[in-house]
Amino acid sequence: YDWAYCQFKQHNFSQALDGFSRYVSVQTGGNRSMLADAYSRIGDCYYYARRFADAEQYYARAQETDVANGDYALFQKAFMAGLQRNHERKIELLDKLIVDYPRSGYLANAWFEKGQAYTILNRNNDAIVCYKQLIADYPQSAIARKGGLQLGMVYFNNGQTDESVAAYQQVIERYPTSEEARIAVADLKSVYVEKDAVDAYANYLNSVGRSEQAPVSELDSLSYMAAERTYMTGKGIASLKKYVRNYPSGAFLIPANYYICLLYTSPSPRD
């Protein structure tokens, strides 16, 4: 057992697997906690070898051997189900973890992974519930930051752009120095372009002290992109005229004015 752990700590997973397998083959009764731990480590070794079905089998043995301390094994069992694309089974096992181990240290991860499974299944409303629960219950956890990003993405994919903006802004304001905040700024940009509200994006970045992440040249490009998108969807030229007005020396004045002229000279001009 100790030799196997030494191999495991050194990432020699093949040797560790051999050691733990020999340990469980001769262990009869005795310390069930150690036996369950060995089963979990065998599961880990199979996981690192990408033998997910075998890993799931040994995590199940670990959880059954020491039920009272089986939250890690149950979480990993659910994770293996997801890696095998059995997302419904993954959700079922995570629900069991949440109910059976209400004080587990893996609950934050369980809510996140459950949200991921629902997202893959295109059950966006269920995913939203999971990410919101994660953020509400574990706001200071690292996984909550990732959950906030996922929440913004799912809202956006759901066509709920206002909610998406709020989710990304929460990540930026609650975790300002994090990598997730930097990603949220970039993702928020796409939402504001979709909303044709680049000015609001610039104003928001100024309000939270991140104006350096949106230089004038980028705002020029984003404003034109949003205006062109509006034009291409048949919604008139108001956004193009606004771009020309706000960026009199803009990099896209020629195509913007061209589109405006096209609309004014069309048989049924649109404003």
What are these language model-derived features?
Residues 1-266, 270:
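Acidic, polar-rich low-complexity tracts and alpha-helical solenoid repeat scaffolds
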